[in-house]
From Swiss-Prot:
This is Elongation factor P. PROSITE patterns: EFP. Involved in peptide bond synthesis. Stimulates efficient translation and peptide-bond synthesis on native or reconstituted 70S ribosomes in vitro. Probably functions indirectly by altering the affinity of the ribosome for aminoacyl-tRNA, thus increasing their reactivity as acceptors for peptidyl transferase. Gene3D superfamilies: 2.30.30.30, Nucleic acid-binding proteins (2.40.50.140). The keyword Cell membrane does not apply. The keyword Cytoplasm applies.
Amino acid sequence: MISSNDFRTGTSIVMDGAVWKVVEFLHVKPGKGSAFVRTKLKSVQTGNVVEKTFRAGETVPQANIEKSVMQHTYKDGDQYVFMDMETFEEVSIAPDTLGDKAKFIKEEMEVSVVTWDGTILDVELPTSVVLEIVETDPGVKGDTATGGTKPAILETGAQVMVPLFIAQGERIKVDTRDGSYLGRDNA
């Protein structure tokens, strides 16, 4: 149990049988009446955001969320198979749990898997990944003057917009949060 006075951004609580993460909180002490805590909560499962007010000192169950580092080993049909880096146990994750993140996951990539009571809630990717371009239109000399972009298909099947000077076979950095081109890979 956690007191509403101890809420901080990122605190996870259980409310109505679901896990909620505190996005914003504000302790309010009105001139008349008792103090309260106004919060914005985000559902970890659905992403919905709700506003909820708690009395000061009210206790709610705290969610015991665990994060474990796992490595994507292979894809079995449409299931993504990850291996826990400490216990070496394998876990299959459905594409609907991954959502849009699935298009940036490649083999041997390390991710953080968030679980609650044995249920996988989320898979957190690194903020950027290096992927190879497998298909794009060829660049023509002098194309950079216009500053335009063209579509490129990556090794994972994702499609991103890249500058005109980028060629097929190059390795680029991609932001996993929005799928935007960040630059060429220097390694």
